[in-house]
């Protein structure tokens, strides 16, 4: 008994022409934009949280925006077109001082505020990551230093 092999061949001229997709042509933050994921070192992927930040400002009133947990509140506010005071951008002065009304932030990168001030709700927006949905009154430097 003889067996027969059959194959199907399709001429390339019958298939629609498409440009090949090259990985380098994709946006580098594709996974972050689509799935809230961020590439880590050695190919690891970490989930990234995003929180609602509400700023109560003198000029703009109340403004709310989404802020990833690895972006400083001041930096994201600037990306959103919100003008906030700042000077050092390193958490070592009080120009960007605000007061947390609700929620919480991680401001372990700052060196200006002492533990009592942090416990009282003071925040430096240039060195504060949101750690939950948070509401912050801005433009509070004079009140902090009084």
From Swiss-Prot:
Instruction: Report the CDD domains cross-referenced here.
Output: fer2 (cd00207)
Which Gene3D superfamilies does the record cross-reference, listed alphabetically? 3.10.20.30
- Give the transit peptide, as a residue range: 1-48
Question: Which residues are involved in binding [2Fe-2S] cluster?
Answer: 88, 93, 96, 126
What are this entry's molecular-function GO terms?
2 iron, 2 sulfur cluster binding; electron transfer activity; metal ion binding
Kindly indicate whether the keyword Chloroplast belongs to this entry.
Answer: yes
Q: Which cofactor does it need?
A: [2Fe-2S] cluster
According to its UniProt record, where is this protein located? Plastid, Chloroplast
Instruction: Describe the location of the 2Fe-2S ferredoxin-type domain by residue ranges.
Output: 51-142
Q: Which GO terms describe its biological process?
A: electron transport chain
List keywords of the entry alphabetically. 2Fe-2S, Chloroplast, Electron transport, Iron, Iron-sulfur, Metal-binding, Plastid, Transit peptide, Transport
- Which cellular component appears as one GO term in the record? chloroplast stroma
Chief subcellular location: plastid
For this protein, the record's SUPFAM superfamilies field holds:
2Fe-2S ferredoxin-like
Cofactor: how bound: Binds 1 [2Fe-2S] cluster.
Q: Does the keyword DNA repair apply?
A: no
Subunit note: Forms a complex with heterodimeric ferredoxin-thioredoxin reductase (FTR) and thioredoxin.
Q: What does this protein do?
A: Ferredoxins are iron-sulfur proteins that transfer electrons in a wide variety of metabolic reactions.
Family to which this protein belongs: Belongs to the 2Fe2S plant-type ferredoxin family.
Protein name per its UniProtKB record: Ferredoxin, chloroplastic
Organism of origin is Silene latifolia subsp. alba
Identify the taxonomic lineage of the organism of origin. Eukaryota, Viridiplantae, Streptophyta, Embryophyta, Tracheophyta
Q: Which gene encodes it?
A: PETF
